[in-house]
């Protein structure tokens, strides 16, 4: 049903913001992973503000299907904070680095849409999702093999994102 005054894309962004930014910060803050007191609250708010900026960008997705700036993968950041049982200082470093990267024009892979190496990326993403599910069942004692598989995907994702960014910059130079 088409309702002319209803913007489904806006609703999708609202749901995504709550799911990928707000709830992960509530989890980390309420479970004590960010420490205690005012500094923990400020630390939880920083990714929320960075994500608000990211969600409002009209150029958040590039023509070659990359996210421009760190996408709001705060749920994944929170996952690793919990699985690795990071101390508040380590969690703060992870969150602050990711928050800064929101503003750095690096293109990040959109796994289901980025064309370059899509088959490999989707296969590795599927393996990563399986490792994610297994690791969730193993908290607080994650198995080293599943953790290595999971983190290897993160390395692949970052390396591919940097490669595609460099390739795009060379093409426009």
Short names for language-model regions:
Residues 5, 39-40, 58, 88, ...:
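Hydrophobic alpha-helical segments and their boundary regions
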Residues 1-5, 58, 65-68, 173:
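Cytosolic, membrane-interface loops and tails of multi-pass inner-membrane proteins
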Residues 50-72:
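Membrane-anchoring/interfacial helices and their immediately flanking loops
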Residues 30-34, 62, 170:
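Membrane-interface elements of multi-pass transporters and channels
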Residues 15-19, 57, 78, 108:
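Hydrophobic side chains within alpha-helical segments
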